[in-house]
């Protein structure tokens, strides 16, 4: 089955080289409006979006986000932050803490945002970000997610003057495709390894071998990690890498 929306989703690729054409205010507004129409828990909209066009700020982010120069070349960056600050400010200004103390026999207890609150806000944030991605794509504007914004929490908190209960979730680079841009599509896992009916399916060793057959072809014996197979190489490059540890550290700091 095909339609314009499905084609837009399925033809989208991460874009790291951008045309010289600027993103117009009208285009940007359309993207932001689409983001804000994303599904949200209880209509709380537990996120904020910071529009970044200042070149100096983009240069700083290109370094703090794992030294990726293309970030500075994107016409517009959108920083999506999980935001419990606004609601908890609203609670404080309207005596919610005092209300909880008055009604404590009913089980009310006013607390700062918990881990689950950050997860819920992160869900809202990423749904909004993906709406922005699809809206931009429909306008001929490419995008690239930068997960490294989760790193270096203290630096980014200061750079963007983030108050308590606000945490960077994703940085989105936006820019027009260059004429005749060659879209390179990366193969996804077979749906049978991702989509399960009714309950989770634990893969067998044989199924894991089949699932990762194409990925394992990327293994190189001369890899810099001295890994003996693809799984070891990928873990060293991604899951167990220093940037991943820094993400975890930043996350823990934000929760304090």
Which role fits each region the language model picked out?
Residues 1-256:
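Acidic, surface-exposed loops and disordered segments
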């Amino acid at each position: 089955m095909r339609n314009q929306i499905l084609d837009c989703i399925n033809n989208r690729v991460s874009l790291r080289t951008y045309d010289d054409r600027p993103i117009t205010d009208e285009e940007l507004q359309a993207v932001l409006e689409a983001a804000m129409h994303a599904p949200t828990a209880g209509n709380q909209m537990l996120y904020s979006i910071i529009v970044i066009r200042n070149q100096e700020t983009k240069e700083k982010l290109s370094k703090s986000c794992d030294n990726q120069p293309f970030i500075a070349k994107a016409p517009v960056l959108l920083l999506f932050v999980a935001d419990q600050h606004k609601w908890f400010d609203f609670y404080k200004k309207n005596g919610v803490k005092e209300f909880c103390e008055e009604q404590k026999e009913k089980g009310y207890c006013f607390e700062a945002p918990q881990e689950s609150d950050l997860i819920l806000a992160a869900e809202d944030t990423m749904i909004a970000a993906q709406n922005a991605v699809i809206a931009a794509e429909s306008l001929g504007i490419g995008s690239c997610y930068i997960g490294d914004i989760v790193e270096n929490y203290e630096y980014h908190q200061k750079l963007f003057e983030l108050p308590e209960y606000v945490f960077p979730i994703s940085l989105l680079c936006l820019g027009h495709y260059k004429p005749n841009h060659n879209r390179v599509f990366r193969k996804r896992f077979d749906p049978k390894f991702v989509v399960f009916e009714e309950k989770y399916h634990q893969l067998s060793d044989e199924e894991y071998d089949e699932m990762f057959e194409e990925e394992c072809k990327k293994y190189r014996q001369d890899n810099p990690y001295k890994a003996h197979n693809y799984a070891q190489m990928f873990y060293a490059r991604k899951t167990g890498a220093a940037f991943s540890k820094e993400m975890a550290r930043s996350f823990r700091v934000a929760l304090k």
